């Protein structure tokens, strides 16, 4: 008798079927229309080929192209079609790897002559031909020796190397699309035709094989693929808008910062940019005042501390190190610039005996950290080697963990709201396979944080979306990640709350409990902005440089129409500064339209125009960024209005 499998469907119904039935068979048994639309199926959330037998009992879902999960399959299949197209057009080109990435895919090719942008339309045309052929995807499992021989005979040395890297106990899956085949874990859709035509090749770049600069340079072709043309068009439109908002371009136009070759990955802040940076720090300091103790730990520490923390073992290659001769010692000492603030904060906590009555202790730092990032990964303010973290570490008891996590959540959400971010997602990441701490410890922490996650959703009235990422926690404890959506729909992971079972134990941190016993504190890592530089990059792009008045690096420019108003413009500027506004006078002998245009391009929020009439009346003509409207006000009224507008939201709340 054939082995049976009990399948639970999305509507809750249960059916017993032959375990040898495939996903395609199950779809066909439900309806012919579903079978026609099906591209894959999921067993207990894991995607499979339609041709795979169900094999066992579980929860089953038939996946169609309308399902968001189908996007990964569309992109994966498009990468295979890209590789086939390239080898049809340029025989002898070696294919290497071609994964799905965010919003698309890429494939790396080994070819004597690198591809250029001019090649992309030709490749894209060939890809559409392959899609039209609608060849079936089929899977074979090959013995290791056969796979190596076949790929070696084809001249695919990179594939042979990949096969050697696959563990002996794993099957070697080969996927065919017609006569063309590739080494792949899968899964794939039923045929190339199911990819559709909503794809586009985007760019070419160089990439070292296996990311190793000592290995050959390959050509990487990037593409994007979507379920339909409307989604593709929306994505391309978003990219176009993102290009206009690129913080690197706006940083130049607004004279905020620059980078140069002598300091890769470190920021040269100009006066206006540094003022904006300080505005952010000042805002954050006000939010922490009275709740956190601001501290400052050394930037350079002996490597022995990093050995104790564990960073030296698993993070040493990403640290900046220096050897110094100690006059009193025979050997050189090795120091490192700190890549993170947490070990330093543990040292501060350990300095002096702590009682349970002292807890929670909340230590915050705007700490400069340095991490060695590959030069190819550097990207403006978004990915740098030297940056400032708005780091805090809370040392508390287990009983205080839930309350502290909720307080952190409230602070993070209100901070994001002050900067105009209302669409927030909170992801709860649970224990990974490799971790420290007992199962009982993880059970307790996950139970507490799971309850906090429910409260976050309830208290927001459903406005804050929450989700669980099983197995995605840090090795030292479970965590919350806060993801915000910007003005053009992009998502950015910024804030985090992480429970740490590791560092307090490694450093022997303890407090004295109510029974006069030593007890290890619960340590919480907390960041709101994360990297201050990156957060500023996000803000620049979110606002497209049109900052609210309270956060603008230069709030007001006083521009004269004629030299007759120069003295008055100087007086206006001084009064604005005396009122706490950042202001500059533009007294150049240029036409007023030229001045207005120049300052508008520099994204100055308010321009006060002064001519002979304004000087006589004691008034100003107000022009605002992005508006053609003009308004004449007496100077005192204008200043009062601007002071009110320039009041930061946290101060406004405190006054209410």
Swiss-Prot record:
Gene Ontology molecular functions: ATP binding; metal ion binding; threonine-tRNA ligase activity; tRNA binding
Cited CDD domains: TGS_ThrRS, ThrRS_anticodon, ThrRS_core
One GO term of the biological process aspect: threonyl-tRNA aminoacylation
Protein's job: Catalyzes the attachment of threonine to tRNA(Thr) in a two-step reaction: L-threonine is first activated by ATP to form Thr-AMP and then transferred to the acceptor end of tRNA(Thr). Also edits incorrectly charged L-seryl-tRNA(Thr).
Gene field: thrS
Alphabetized InterPro entries for the sequence: aa-tRNA-synt_IIb (IPR002314), aa-tRNA-synth_II (IPR006195), aa-tRNA-synth_II/BPL/LPL (IPR045864), Anticodon-bd (IPR004154), Anticodon-bd_dom_sf (IPR036621), Beta-grasp_dom_sf (IPR012675), TGS (IPR004095), TGS-like (IPR012676)
Subunit structure and binding partners: Homodimer.
Ranges where the record places region Catalytic: 246-548
Cofactor annotation remark: Binds 1 zinc ion per subunit.
One term under GO cellular component: cytosol
Cofactors (names): Zn(2+)
Major site of localization recorded for this protein: cytoplasm
PROSITE patterns: AA_TRNA_LIGASE_II (PS50862), TGS (PS51880)
Keywords: Aminoacyl-tRNA synthetase, ATP-binding, Cytoplasm, Ligase, Metal-binding, Nucleotide-binding, Protein biosynthesis, RNA-binding, tRNA-binding, Zinc
Lineage, broadest ranks: Bacteria, Pseudomonadati, Pseudomonadota, Alphaproteobacteria, Hyphomicrobiales
Name by which UniProt lists this protein: Threonine--tRNA ligase
UniProt subcellular location: Cytoplasm
Catalytic activity: tRNA(Thr) + L-threonine + ATP = L-threonyl-tRNA(Thr) + AMP + diphosphate + H(+)
Binding site for Zn(2+): 342, 393, 525
